[in-house]
Amino acid sequence: MDNLFSTNHELIPKIEKEKLLKQKGICLWLTGLSGSGKTSIAKSVAKKLHSKGFITKVLDGDNIRLGINKNLSFSELDRMENIRRTAEISKLFVDCGIITICCLVSPKEKMRTLAKEIIGEKNFYEIFIATSL
């Protein structure tokens, strides 16, 4: 049986969108302890980039859990699903040439590896926020 669903959804290639926007679509994945300042840093970076003419989108783990991930608990399995869904959303923005800043605790290496695999290694920048609480 033929696959009814195409895996190639892009009518216009990412590179063409990036040329139009004059920027590269990337994901800055901010990770660190709860309360370490990930969201505050992400908002500050987004404002600074906007002032320089860049289009950004902040995906905050707390806000994502209020919407698309509201059915998930904090079990390890659900945390992995939270990361997977957020990474898939980020990839949609990245593929449109948008700088996406994700703020998630993502405490396990396998969680961050999953996000990197979904988004793409060349588009993924992991930033660990290490602050005293």
Per-region residue spans from a language model:
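Glycine-rich phosphate-binding loop of ATP-dependent small-molecule kinases
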Residues: 1-103, 107-133
